[in-house]
Swiss-Prot record:
Reactions it catalyzes: thiosulfate + hydrogen cyanide = thiocyanate + sulfite + 2 H(+)
More details: Was identified as a high-confidence drug target.
Keywords: Repeat, Transferase
Gene source species: Mycobacterium tuberculosis (strain ATCC 25618 / H37Rv)
Class in the EC hierarchy, top level: transferase
UniProt domain Rhodanese: residue ranges: 20-138, 169-280
Annotated PANTHER family: SULFURTRANSFERASE, THIOSULFATE SULFERTANSFERASE
Disulfide bonds: none
Active site: C241 (cysteine persulfide intermediate)
GO molecular function ontology, one term from the record: thiosulfate-cyanide sulfurtransferase activity
Name by which UniProt lists this protein: Putative thiosulfate sulfurtransferase SseB
Residues engaged in binding substrate: R183
Pfam families per record: Rhodanese
Gene encoding the protein: sseB
Length: 284
């Protein structure tokens, strides 16, 4: 299977699995910056058999201080979550959302960092499923308890590459900022106390790797995007955003074309919390 097929699944492919009766665990990870709790929307309509996962409460650990707005969960707490969701050994997992692939990319990153195999993002999310004529169910889904084992208790040192704040600021890595340009420039900052970016970072908004319909760009377009920003394919790349959510979209997009990338989980919310760290503003 090519890299793209290891990261993404199309609505047609998923529908085929469901119709064939093939086992699959589907996680609904709806999350928006302005509406972080997607549970009500989930209850109103979701993919058949999908289980809701809270990005805020289950894919983050807010008891951790000093690591940004969405610290990574512990392996133990994540194992309880994925077993609640019915995830089993050797059963594929599909994650989806309805906005900008942020929720599903975060789930994909967290689950794969934990050592869970065969996790894919529904390309285009819920809109793609609806456009393909996929059926929708309502209400809560409570599956049989799963048995999957999380292999890493510390996801900061799990199976996906990460950056610390010190590493993000030390150079030696091409650092990408996945936030919208106005936040990168420091024109506005709707969430964190300080506006701006990590000096030396390149602004590659998470939305720039998606087509108008919310699917990931084709491999050729993704490679061209790297070239346009002067990013060497195969070189060391780090990615951050506000708090380690939308940056996962860029990490996933790079994985689609076989490029590893290191996520800075604390991102700008961690970096900017220390007044001794430098702040870049403007386009450079």
């Amino acid at each position: 299977m090519q890299a793209r097929g290891q990261v993404l699944i199309t609505a047609a492919e998923l529908a085929g699995m469901i119709q064939a009766g093939d086992p699959v665990s589907i996680l609904d990870v709806r999350w928006r910056l302005d509406e972080p709790d997607g549970h009500a929307a989930y209850l109103q309509g979701h993919l058949p058999g999908a289980v809701f996962v809270s990005l805020e409460d289950e894919l983050s650990d807010h008891t951790i201080a000093g690591r940004g707005r969405h610290p990574l969960p512990s392996g133990a707490s994540l194992q309880a979550t994925v077993r609640r969701c019915g995830i089993r050994h050797d059963v594929p997992v599909v994650v989806y959302d309805d906005w900008n692939r942020a929720g599903s990319a975060r789930a994909w990153w967290v689950l794969t960092a934990a050592g869970i195999a065969n996790v894919r993002i529904l390309d285009g999310g819920l809109p793609a499923w609806r456009s393909a004529g996929g059926s929708i169910e309502t209400g809560q889904v409570s599956p049989q308890l799963g048995n999957v084992t999380v292999l890493h208790d510390d996801l900061y040192a799990g199976q996906r590459l990460t950056l610390t704040a010190q590493q993000a600021g030390a150079g030696g890595v091409t650092l990408l900022d996945a936030r919208v340009p106005e936040r990168f420039r420091g024109d506005v900052e709707p969430v964190d106390a300080v506006a701006g970016h990590i000096p030396g970072a390149i602004n590659v908004p998470s939305g720039s790797v998606l087509a108008d319909d919310g699917t990931f760009l084709g491999n050729g377009a993704l490679n061209a995007l790297l070239s346009d920003h002067g990013i060497d394919h195969g070189g060391r790349v780090g990615v951050y955003c506000g708090s380690g959510v939308s940056a996962a979209v860029i990490v996933a997009a790079l994985a689609v074309i076989g490029q590893d990338a290191e996520l800075f989980p604390g991102s700008w919310s961690e970096w900017s919390s220390d007044p001794t760290r430098p702040v870049g503003r403007g386009t450079a």
